[in-house]
Amino acid sequence: MEIRTIKIPEISKKAFEVFTSNRNVLRMHEYQLAVLKISDTIEDGDTQEQAQGSYSILKEMLGFIRAVLNLNDEDYDKLLDLENKRTQEIAEKLVGYMYGLTDEQLENATGETDPKD
């Protein structure tokens, strides 16, 4: 099991440990499968279905981040106050870590660097 760290200064001054344990890899796959399933069902849906899908995807993403980083209630509240784009960046980085990617590989894949790290 590899242990990585992720800095999220908006939540904590201390870096969070990210364990690439089977438990977290399972969480990552559950999150990805849920997002894919929701995306498939709302693709041709009406406005209400699309709004419900967006809501469900956000809830899945927040739950995934909270579980992997083991956030307490106070830190989770701080996560809720982040911009959606930043929350997506965190989730993408965690997914990359579960696949064994390095920070450099993640930066190359997105073509940008994260000024907060």
Where would I find each of the regions flagged by the language model?
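Short, surface-exposed, charged amphipathic helix/loop patches that serve as local interaction elements
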Residues: K14-A15, F19-D117
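Short, intrinsically disordered N-terminal pre-domain segments
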Residues: M1-S12
